[in-house]
Amino acid sequence: ARDYVDKVISKELYDEVLTAQLSNGFVLKRIMPTYLKSDTESAGHATLLEWPNLDYVPKQVKRYVTSKKVRICVVQYQMRSLKSFKEFATQCEYFVDVASGYKSDFILFPEIFTLQLLSYLPNERPGIAVRTLADLTPKYLDLFNKLSIKHNINIIGGSHYTREDDDIYNIAYLFRRDGSIEKQYKIHITPNERKWWGVKPGDKIEVFDTDRGKINIQICYDIEFPELSRIATQKGAELIFVPFCTDERYGYLRVRYCAQARCIENGVYAAIAGNVGNLPFVENMDIQYAQSGIYTPSDFQFSRDAIAAECTPNIETVIIHDIDMELVKRHRFSGSTLNWKDRRSDLYEVVLKK
């Protein structure tokens, strides 16, 4: 019986019933022997056929994502005297090219690393110098926008002093690899920034959608205020980028310890990038100290000491590391402690007023 059916299927034999059924889309499921003993022509055999319903859509099997890797490159950047904007652009493209070569999804530059451009501009008092620097904003934006597209990478372009309505703001720009640009204003201004540059604060906490998840950017001093990270996490952020600029180790440790605390409090990752080296003849930028890094919550599924990767202190270098965005999602609801889930909203809350 099996041989007979196979020959009908291969068109070697013609069967009035079976050939017609197969030609109309019926599918042979199996042969049933001794199905009808009185059918002498078929020796009691029968075929079980299925005619598929073309309008039927089977229920899809749910597939759960178990891992979502994101590769981050953090630049620990050395401040240096420059002779032109082109020299600055060459140095920036070098780092972007390195990150792209290692297939990074994001590259993070430090806070106000564009202040090194003042080394070739006229030596003026700080209030005038920062406005001269702000005049280079279109060139800065054009440079990093082109680099993000050319090298297919999302760039957090450190931060840059920008003039809006004749006020100076410290702004971190996100350059997506699709060519779009977003910005986050520094919300808390340090005493030094007010004294030397007259910087004004922003008042919006942004969470940006990217092709690798939702991110938040907090510029240096901002990471020392836990309310910002709480609000950003409530808005969906899973990764916080912190460009910073500190002149000595005490200031650096404030940024670093607060970034690590924010990771534990909110179940997020944090990447921090700072400047190193000396910059003569630029007011308030004489010395720099940094040990840039990528930090995690503190639990079994994450890195030892909650440090995913870390630079050697105070030298120009990069670190490149993969983080798993699915881990932080699961950690918030199944970690050893549930800092996010166990908040006492009946006792306290963090409210964004604007």
Regions found by a protein language model. Name each.
Residues 146, 162-239, 248-261, 334-337, ...:
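Active-site catalytic loop in hydrolytic enzyme cores
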Residues 1-70:
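Terminal substrate-recognition subdomain of acyl/acetyltransferases
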Residues 85-177, 182, 246-261, 265:
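Cys-nucleophile CN-hydrolase/nitrilase-fold catalytic domain and related Cys-dependent amidase chemistry
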Residues 134-156, 223-316:
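CN hydrolase (nitrilase-like) catalytic-core segments centered on the catalytic cysteine
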Residues 157-158, 171-174, 206, 272, ...:
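Short beta-strand scaffold segments in enzyme catalytic cores
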Residues 66-81:
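Generic N-terminal amphipathic, Lys/Arg-enriched alpha-helix
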Residues 43-48, 169, 203-205, 287-290, ...:
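Short hydrophobic/aromatic beta-strand or adjacent loop that forms the aromatic wall/cage
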Residues 323-354:
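A short C-terminal boundary segment appended to hydrolase-like catalytic domains
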